[in-house]
Regions:
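Loop-rich non-cytosolic ectodomains and luminal regions
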Residues: 1-224
């Protein structure tokens, strides 16, 4: 599922999702992407927005939206979407000219509907269908979006694996990361301080350190 961050409007907390999720195939083979609305209470998909990636649609996108966000005649105003969210979801695809890999992008800007209480019963997710043996990696904009299974079976949690910068991926580049040696530190006032919400785990990769397994199998960083 695509998770966002909290925003307060008129004393109520809503979830704002804004940014892109990009999906890369391991080669030029197209695949199918579905953005979905999922009822967390009932445990089922309530609506699907499907976009296949045949050659004739390469370089194009399709948007589904609430009425106030319609920009062109091609945008589809969807009543089911509008019942639970304000905003839009768009899906498009192309072939990366540098790597030759097929990729798709989910462009999302949604806010829980202001016409009902922010019960958070509905989530936005995506389903990918590829061919046998095909590998597809998904990357979310980490400053505004995250990927979460919400504890539902059959869905996948996101991770920071793959967050390493492309500047570190050169074959003659030494990539140095960081690990957590302690979860608290002393200050000049004589007290020790910690930051529990930062996710610091002694002996593990630090949250500020990117890492990942590249498509050619290399694991970065080289040094922690």
């Amino acid at each position: 599922f695509i998770d966002g961050g909290p925003i307060e409007i008129e004393g109520k907390e809503y979830t704002l999702r804004y940014g892109n999720v990009e999906l890369y195939s391991n080669d030029e083979t197209p695949f199918e992407v579905q953005a979905v609305i999922y009822n967390l209470n009932r445990g089922r998909v309530t609506n699907r927005f499907s976009f296949t990636l045949p050659e004739e649609t390469k370089g194009t996108a399709q948007y589904w939206c609430s009425e106030a966000y319609q920009q062109t005649d091609n945008d589809i105003v969807d009543k089911s979407f509008s019942q639970n969210f304000e905003g839009y979801i768009g899906i498009g695809w192309a072939v990366d000219p540098y790597s030759g890999r097929a990729y798709a992008a989910i462009d999302v800007c949604t806010l829980d509907s202001l016409n009902r209480d922010p019960s958070k019963n509905y989530a936005i997710g995506f389903i990918v269908k590829g061919r046998e043996g095909q590998r597809i990696d998904a990357f979310a904009m980490g400053d505004s979006l995250s990927l979460d299974s919400y504890g539902r079976e059959g869905w996948t949690d996101g991770s920071c694996n793959g967050s390493v910068s492309d500047m570190c991926t050169g074959k003659q580049t030494l990539c140095v990361g960081a690990y957590t040696s302690t979860d608290s530190w002393a200050q000049l006032d004589g007290f020790a301080y910690s930051l529990p919400e930062a996710g610091l785990t002694t002996g593990h990769v630090a949250p500020i350190s990117s890492y990942g397994t590249l498509i050619d199998g290399r694991n970065l960083p080289h040094v922690l």
